[in-house]
Design a protein with these regions (language model features):
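NAD(P)-dependent short-chain dehydrogenase/reductase
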Residues: 1-16, 21-30
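Generic structural signal for alpha-helix termini and adjacent loop/cap motifs
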Residues: 4, 34-35, 124
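Residues that recognize and position ribonucleotide moieties
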Residues: 8, 17, 50, 79, ...
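Non-catalytic, hydrophobic alpha-helical segments
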Residues: 24, 46, 57, 103, ...
């Protein structure tokens, strides 16, 4: 969007955790190949630690873009707005974090902070 607009509005009141597919697949693999898999099967949440909102993610992306191409993105603006600013038929939760407690206790799997995965993803996209 920043390629096409001088200013974008991004929601800042919906809290969640961006979860990369690489985390999901590596966790499923670790669980599946666990020797006690059949005894411990069930429903588990998986998400990185920490939390954020859409505005914060957009801000981080812009900071990375500024490092790559200062002239192109330096004058672009990202404005935080509330969910009500955008008319939507779909209701969105304002707080949608998942708990990894069961996953931690059962399989001793402790995902890293979402920023670690997000930074890696952004770096891969820039290449």
């Amino acid at each position: 969007l920043l390629n096409n607009y001088e200013k974008i509005d991004v929601i800042d009141d919906q809290i969640g955790i961006p979860t990369p597919t690489t985390l999901v697949t590596s966790t499923v693999e670790a669980i599946f190949f666990n020797e006690n898999f059949m005894k411990m099967r069930g429903i588990y949440n998986i998400a990185p630690s920490g939390y954020t909102n859409w505005y914060e993610m957009a801000r981080i992306i812009k900071l990375r873009l500024d490092l790559i191409n200062t002239e192109k993105f330096s004058n672009k603006k990202i404005n935080p707005v509330k969910s009500a600013y955008f008319a939507s038929a779909a209701r969105r939760p304002h707080y949608s974090r998942l708990s990894n407690e069961k996953l931690r206790k059962t399989f001793k799997i402790n995902p890293l902070n979402w920023k670690v995965y997000f930074k890696k993803y952004i770096q891969e996209q820039i290449k």
